[in-house]
Amino acid sequence: MGFNINIIGTGGTRPLHNRYLSSVLIEYNGDNFLFDCGEGTQMSLRKQKISWQKIKMICITHLHADHITGLLGIVMLMSQSGETRKEPLIIAGPVGIKNYTKTNIDILKIYKNYEIIYKEIIIDKTEKIIYEDKTKKIEYTRLKHSIECVGYLFIEKDKPGKFNTEKAEELNIPKGPIRKTLQDGKEILIDGKIIKPSEILGESKKGLKVAYITDTGYFKELIQQIKNFNLVIIESTFKNELKKEADKKLHLTAGGAANIVKQAKVLKTGLIHFSERYTLRKDLENLLKEAKLEYPDGEIFLTKDGMRLEANKNNFIIK
């Protein structure tokens, strides 16, 4: 349970023997959300002993192969794991995600014993919130890439403050569901008097905010979207020396990624989506150095396949 971030893969373009394609799984009190699903994602999930059957929603950033070719394998496995899936699978992504998935299910004659709910995103037209419940929501944000591409914002809702039992007794609020109503942030009526949650509850606790941002070139609008986020997982495809190539392909350099999170005053930043040309650890360390030179006051780290981060107060701790 809890609020955890699992790094499923960290590479771009093609999987390497020690680095699968970029993918992140967020666990939140038993609900699992997978972001991107390139080739080999199921292998990485298996290595990390994460059940694909527990994935509630898969969010695809865009329809390039290195972010989507593992999707059909996950869809198939959910019907072949020996247990019947009890709830629908939600698949979200830019326009085309539904056609891609349904067409391949039909062509490959994939047996499926559960419902899939598709949420296709028409950028700047679809409602920003693509998932919401009592404790959290997921929003999309436009990115700047060679095809339609979105980033995802996982936002934990503020938690209500401590319930003041003594005050509740003073106001003759009976124990039971009516107190729960106040804890849910709703007013109640007692003896003809309206009682507001603020009269009974202490100061609320700010929810944590996590962003998954890949693939994109630099653009200012993104900065405001991730302002003051607790954790941003952002692409760092190239070294700074390849800025021209990065700009042409609409990707970010390490310095470019750091510049964005610096302006956004992000608390903690994980670099991801490393070019296949960087196979040595020292290459990745150089990416990190370039990012830290741009944002020396920032808490920046290299993501790694199999890494896990756990929420701790207003931060995420690498375990």
Swiss-Prot record:
Top EC class, one word: hydrolase
Reactions catalysed: Endonucleolytic cleavage of RNA, removing extra 3' nucleotides from tRNA precursor, generating 3' termini of tRNAs. A 3'-hydroxy group is left at the tRNA terminus and a 5'-phosphoryl group is left at the trailer molecule
S-S bridge residues: none
Active site, UniProt feature: D66 (proton acceptor)
Subunit field text: Homodimer.
Purpose of the protein: Zinc phosphodiesterase, which displays some tRNA 3'-processing endonuclease activity. Probably involved in tRNA maturation, by removing a 3'-trailer from precursor tRNA.
Protein name per the record: Ribonuclease Z
Species of provenance: Borrelia garinii subsp. bavariensis (strain ATCC BAA-2496 / DSM 23469 / PBi)
Lineage, opening ranks: Bacteria, Pseudomonadati, Spirochaetota, Spirochaetia, Spirochaetales
